Design a protein with these regions (language model features):
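N-terminal acidic, proline/glycine-rich, low-complexity intrinsically disordered segments
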Residues: 1-7
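Cysteine-centered metal-binding/redox modules
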Residues: 12, 16-226
Length: 226
């Protein structure tokens, strides 16, 4: 599945290839020394897929949420589809333009723990496994290379909350509520927990002191782990 590992794109998309190629890809990803290497290696795997694969992911996702309310389902499906297709295109453009070569920052802490989690979640075989790995690759690119949430700003959650981007900070209403879920992205996501409604609200257009005070208060009173 990874360029240079003697696995062709046909192998990567062959359901029989299964977990062995994924394990090889994860080992390659985990050895990346900086963000540029990580981005290049993620792109080399993701771009073996196509927009058709993204559409299949969308169809699979729709089946999972078909029983929720139509308003919530349609909003969520639209946002996730935009995110998946947009991230695939971003990876393609960054790879074509050589953008990763200028990214010399070290990989963030927690990257290897993330790939260990992905390895556990991507055991088995079949096309469903390949698409599951693709989902984790896209999320890893967003969280570690782009320093963006695994779920984009505007993603709605049950109860009316959504991921928000306010004054340079991402907030998520479920950041601290899913850490017991084995496959949750929350422990690795750079978003902060959305403050309780009516208690702490992000200041609009704050100065540096206000922003630092808000983040400090969020940490002290809400035990942020982002």
């Amino acid at each position: 599945m990874v360029a240079g590992n003697n696995s062709s794109s046909h192998d990567a998309k062959d359901p029989s290839a299964g977990a062995e190629q994924i394990r090889s890809a994860i080992t390659h990803l985990a050895s990346a020394r900086d963000l540029g290497e990580l981005g290049t290696r993620i792109a080399s795997v993701v771009l073996l897929s196509s927009p058709n694969d993204i559409q299949q992911m969308r169809r699979n996702f729709y089946e999972k949420i078909r029983n929720v309310t139509p308003e919530y389902r349609d909003c969520l499906e639209k946002k996730i589809t935009e995110h998946l297709l947009g991230t695939w295109q971003t990876l393609r453009l960054m790879q074509q333009q050589g953008a990763f070569s200028a990214m010399n920052e070290p990989v963030p802490a927690g990257v290897n723990v993330y790939w260990e989690m992905v390895a556990v979640q991507c055991r088995g075989d079949g096309d469903e496994l390949r698409l599951r790995f693709l989902k984790f690759l896209i999320a890893g690119f967003c969280m570690f290379v782009r320093n963006e949430p695994g779920h984009p700003a505007g993603t709605p959650f049950p109860g009316g909350g959504m991921v928000q981007y306010i004054d340079g900070v991402y907030y998520c209403p479920v950041k601290e509520k899913a850490n017991d879920v084995d496959a949750a992205l929350c422990p690795f996501c750079p978003a902060l927990q959305t403050p309780a409604i009516g208690y702490l609200q992000p200041p609009l257009n704050p100065g540096l002191h206000q922003k630092q005070e808000f983040i400090r208060n969020c940490h002290d009173f809400h035990n942020f782990n982002g």
